[in-house]
């Protein structure tokens, strides 16, 4: 997997990674499969109860959550719903931008209600469905993508923080968000397995 730390550290933007590493559409496909396969691997030894186990998370703070859920620890099902939605959003942006659609600013995002992912089978299904969707978005790229077409930033702060976002940069942004949640997913799993072992 590509090292996203230069972006998270504020040293580079996503478009810099694309340019400097000459990332191709096939690379984006490979990264997608690598991330999905990694997450599926994390689920190999979990059970249904682990998917809905609510971990303790002292850092939990989601200002976008519904009232009363801002400070809850995220279950494995919640995390999978969230990271797949963000990666699919990045892939959807990439399709629009690569095809030359102009004035792209509204977020093409849908997040599966996390409480619906309440079994291991549903978590696996959501991941495989997300793989299918992301790869399908990449298949919509034309032979000559419009790399000079950029997402319209809604705020100056967004533009300053993320930089210019063309098709590959938008895809990388969604994937980086997913990778950034790996440790949280592993910790939620660790707590779930520990709780089951002592039950």
Where are these regions (language model features)?
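Aromatic-glycine hotspot motif
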Residues: 1-77, 81, 86-199
């Amino acid at each position: 997997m590509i090292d996203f730390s230069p972006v998270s550290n504020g040293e580079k933007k996503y478009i810099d990674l694309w340019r400097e590493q000459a990332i191709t559409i096939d690379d984006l496909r490979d990264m997608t499969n690598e991330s999905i396969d990694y997450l599926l691997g994390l689920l190999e030894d979990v059970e249904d109860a682990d998917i809905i186990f609510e971990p303790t998370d002292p850092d939990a703070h989601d200002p976008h959550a519904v009232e009363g859920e801002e400070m809850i620890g995220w279950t494995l099902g919640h995390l999978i719903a969230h990271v797949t939605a963000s990666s699919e959003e990045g892939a959807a942006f990439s399709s629009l931008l690569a095809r030359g659609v102009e004035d792209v600013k509204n977020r093409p995002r849908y997040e599966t209600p996390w409480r619906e992912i309440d079994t291991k089978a549903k978590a696996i299904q959501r991941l495989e469905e997300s793989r299918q969707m992301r790869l399908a978005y990449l298949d919509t790229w034309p032979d000559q993508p419009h790399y000079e077409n950029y997402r319209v930033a809604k705020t100056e702060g967004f533009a300053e923080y993320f930089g210019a976002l063309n098709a590959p940069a938008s895809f990388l942004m969604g994937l980086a968000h997913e990778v950034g949640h790996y440790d949280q997913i592993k910790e939620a799993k660790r707590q779930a397995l520990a709780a089951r072992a002592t039950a």
